[in-house]
């Protein structure tokens, strides 16, 4: 086992257009097979579509959408005497953002529109309006935590 300790956290550079680190993280999560240029084109096109459809500032819609999807609680498996309990725990700030981005990208990929930029725009608008797959996933996560509230004292 390594004695060096955990690897240092690497910080991402802000994106060139909106100068936002959250946008860079989103683009990286959207990327498949190392094709970052394609990922950027899809994302910026999606934001253009969001701007056209909502008549609001696209970056604000994006940030609000991510904020709306961020979970407050999640469950973690904890073994106690041979039984595994789903223990509700609060989600750390960085993980909130990571989960929100992951859910938005995954549910955008599952949508029915033809182009990925259209799917992503649709999912962002839905998340902005507190509807859609990513919001449902957040609510399901919260329901799981609420249902297992009895095991909260097993928190570590």
From Swiss-Prot:
GO BP annotations, alphabetical order: translation
CDD domains: uS7_Bacteria
Mitochondrion recorded as keyword: no
GO molecular function: rRNA binding; structural constituent of ribosome; tRNA binding
One Pfam family linked to the record: Ribosomal_S7
Annotated InterPro entries: Ribosomal_uS7, Ribosomal_uS7_bac/org-type, Ribosomal_uS7_CS, Ribosomal_uS7_dom, Ribosomal_uS7_dom_sf
Gene Ontology CC, one term: small ribosomal subunit
PROSITE patterns: RIBOSOMAL_S7
Source taxon at top rank: Bacteria
Signal peptide region: none
UniProt KW keywords: Ribonucleoprotein, Ribosomal protein, RNA-binding, rRNA-binding, tRNA-binding
Self-association state and partner proteins as the record states: Part of the 30S ribosomal subunit. Contacts proteins S9 and S11.
Assigned protein family: Belongs to the universal ribosomal protein uS7 family.
General function of this protein: One of the primary rRNA binding proteins, it binds directly to 16S rRNA where it nucleates assembly of the head domain of the 30S subunit. Is located at the subunit interface close to the decoding center, probably blocks exit of the E-site tRNA.
Protein name: Small ribosomal subunit protein uS7
Organism field: Natranaerobius thermophilus (strain ATCC BAA-1301 / DSM 18059 / JW/NM-WN-LF)
Taxonomic path: Bacteria, Bacillati, Bacillota, Clostridia, Natranaerobiales
The gene coding this protein: rpsG
